[in-house]
Amino acid sequence: MRVALGIEYDGSRYYGWQRQLDVDSVQGQLEKALSKVANEPITVQCAGRTDTGVHGTGQVVHFDTNAIRKETAWTLGVNVNLPDDIAVRWVKVVDEEFHARFSATARRYRYMIYNHQLRPGILRSGVSHYRGNIDEDKMHQAAQLFVGEHDFTSFRALQCQSKTPFREIHEVNVTRQGMYICVDIKANAFLHHMVRNIVGTLLEIGKGNQPKEWVNTLLALKDRSKAAATAQPNGLYLVDVTYPEHFQLPKLALGPLFMLD
């Protein structure tokens, strides 16, 4: 039997999503909890692996199991065995053809910026703090230059293992609510550090340090060293994964939940 789960987590105290030896990971904690409920070893496949300090409100995973359990076992039962900063949000038994990663047609991230001279207290692990004047309208205008299929060599990590630097961005929106700026970006897939590198570049434009046309220059250069510094991890959320309608997966309100959808 193949089971899909919707997962939410605060990634601030984990060394990323992927299971690793000798360090705590979101995948490791989830598999441990699932294995207790299934009474057999469980390995999960995810829609997108997030880095150290990055959060997820719309992560999707699947796993195969011989265990027959009620839905409440895979939700309430697993949540009882998870740390407080990881939670199962929904469950669905799916066809064998479903794959959390390869069936996905798009991923959506939101990057939350706290734009204020003084650092935050309560939300310090859920937002990235940037001081000074930031023009979100300039950021939004520049962000439109990323839309479409491009070679994102200038915006991927040097250690990125993807065989191709080409990705297609479907839409990018930059909005402000008071002190909070949200960069909302959807694409078919993302390269390692791609969202944070894009945000770093947009911040330089929003601060007035570069013109919006800098985006086109960086895309053409295909050189990571010419782009802006990588933005902090703690403001980044994987908020949604898109799948073909016939899988009929549950849809929740987009996060993070302290922001209006």
Curated annotation (Swiss-Prot):
Subunit structure: Homodimer.
InterPro entries linked to this entry: PsdUridine_synth_cat_dom_sf, PsdUridine_synth_TruA, PsdUridine_synth_TruA_a/b_dom, PsdUridine_synth_TruA_C, TruA/RsuA/RluB/E/F_N
GO BP, one annotated term: tRNA pseudouridine synthesis
EC number(s) reported in the record: 5.4.99.12
Catalytic activity: uridine(38/39/40) in tRNA = pseudouridine(38/39/40) in tRNA
Entry superkingdom: Bacteria
Catalytic residue positions: D51
Molecular-function annotations in GO: RNA binding; tRNA pseudouridine(38-40) synthase activity
Function comment: Formation of pseudouridine at positions 38, 39 and 40 in the anticodon stem and loop of transfer RNAs.
Enzyme category, top tier: isomerase
CDD domains found in the cross-reference section: PseudoU_synth_EcTruA
PANTHER family, per database record: PSEUDOURIDYLATE SYNTHASE, TRNA PSEUDOURIDINE SYNTHASE-LIKE 1
Positions contributing to substrate binding: Y109
Name of the molecule in the record: tRNA pseudouridine synthase A
Keywords recorded for this protein, A-Z: Isomerase, tRNA processing
Family: Belongs to the tRNA pseudouridine synthase TruA family.
